[in-house]
Amino acid sequence: MLFSLSHGTRIVQDTAALQPVPSDGPPSPPFARGAAVLENPAEALERLDAKPISAVVEGAVASTATAATRSMAISTAPGAFRYLFRDAPGLPAGPATLAALDQLAESMAVETADPGDASIPPILTYFGQFIDHDITANTDREVPGLSEIVGDIDPMDRVQVEQGLDNLREGTLALDSLYGDSPGQGAFATKLAQLMRHPTFTDKMRLGVTADSGDGRPPLPADPAADLLRLGFLLDRGDITEAELNALDPALRENFVDADGPIRSRAIIGDGRNDENLLVAQLHVAFLRLHNRMVDLGHDFEEARRLTRFHYQWLVLNSFLPGICANDVVDEVLATGAPLYAEFLDDNPPADPAKLPMPLEFSVAGFRFGHSMVRGGYDHNRFFGTPVAGSTQILPFASFELLFAFTGGGKMRPDPSAAPGTNLPGNWVIEWDRMVNAETPRRSARRIDTHLAPPLDDMVNQASRPGTPPMMKRLAMRNLRRGYRLNMPSAQALIEAINATGLYRPIPVLTPGQVSEGRDFLVAPGLDAATPLWFYVLREAELVGGNHLGALGSHLVANTLIGLVVNDAGSYWNAKIDGHRWSPHLFQPSQPIDSLKAMLRFTGLLA
């Protein structure tokens, strides 16, 4: 279980012993405007019926994606990050390259008049982030030596990088970010994982309820289970005590306690990063509800988990990838079973077959294309977006800053001067029908291009530790410098290496002029011909219209995600029903969960 992960933070292992001491949790503090008081939530929850999803709103999932420390509770051997091609040349080293990278970051952060609307629905932006959190953790965290990206830096030796970076995820699409019960956890993480299961209906996962905002709530879901379970609820029930929190190792304790006492808004979930912004948090709620709906169909916990994983994996390969990659590349990689990843796996056999190696080129660069898809604000719901009959608009859209504020890390308050809250206010529940189509402005993702929305140049809830350099809040600069420090192959070198395998049709290479157009400063240090991989992935997508990745980006993303599923013995790909590969259509022929829309309908979140 990853308790909290915020950018530029160190890793802490949970080894503290629990010391239970009876104590009453403090009362819920009042909320500021946009939030509300949830009076006596335990009493309301105990009245819920045992059968439907609403029976599990007693909650337990812990996360604080915006805290200054990421704490990890796994004590078994971690997974591995490895280079796809260790010998592929990197960027030219030296001060001229660093200066050009910083100038490149500045150019990417400029707000343009073009709104950048894509034909991609916003849900894919945050489904991508959810996937990333499920399969990788560590490449952008505080690791001595490797995480030094400020000032004059040089590329690290690749052997040192591989030896110094551990993947704190399984490296498979197994939803350990949802269930949080990986083997070998410390005592406190083990207790939290147990609390994530409903105490009475033990096959179900707990969820939380929303607070009364005074403005009403969107009509879906029809039951109260619309939030993650949070620390305040567990404190009020006595499931966790302040004494237990105070007895934790200091680095672990700061994820749950600050100068004002317990962080009551802290979500208790398998990966704290999934509560770093509200859109990912609400998607996490959807997958918890998916598990619980499987239980409603009569499946026990393990079978419900297996079916939830299968549907998730199927959606990644058959909904997410076609939505963001060049479809001819996806078709080619699916038809051949991702041989590029298979060769990578042969070169990097894992010590634990349950933990697949992760390509650094994917994690550090290729899969960060989603940063370009982030909007500065969204048509979130009828209160923070386009109103509907009978509703009162509070704001014309939900700003990026507010979507970070109404999380555990933001303490459910519109600004730091407001009183903190515990639960998500009801008027902040997402209306998913605004996120699954790309029909109107603020109801689509931004195009995948070489510009980032202005809020990504001053990241909220990031780098909050005193003394953290300002650049840690600047996403483009952080990505470019980290890629340089971790000695990523240049994009052109990577294309040459992939093409040399002969596994696929040749990947075309952008000309130096196509790379440097409008950015002549890339020419002198040679970055037009040996280009930072992250920037190149965005640039080639930009040149094909920005509605999907280009050839290299599509290959990196499709080969990795398909390869993880194909090479996981427990995945849907390797499960058979009457001789046929498992699919949602075989599981539920009349109403298959074969799209994100179908999943949201099945979970009661979309009409």
Language-model region placement:
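Terminal regions of secretory-pathway proteins
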Residues: 1-273, 277-278, 299-607
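Fold-level signature of zinc-dependent metallopeptidase catalytic domains
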Residues: 273-276, 280-289, 293-297
